[in-house]
Amino acid sequence: MELTLGDLQQIELICIEASAWGLREEVVDEAETLINDGYQPVVAYEMAYNDWVK
């Protein structure tokens, strides 16, 4: 699957916001698991962020 520049920017913004909460590693780890489960990368990062940063 190829990611667009917009996808990469959105993922990076999610990671920056997660980092502000000290949760970047947790969000990335969960997003990678969700991607392996078949979710689209941007959706996976959004879900992981929403799960960790409530």
Which residues are covered by each model-predicted region?
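C-terminal alpha-helical interaction appendages
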Residues: 1-54
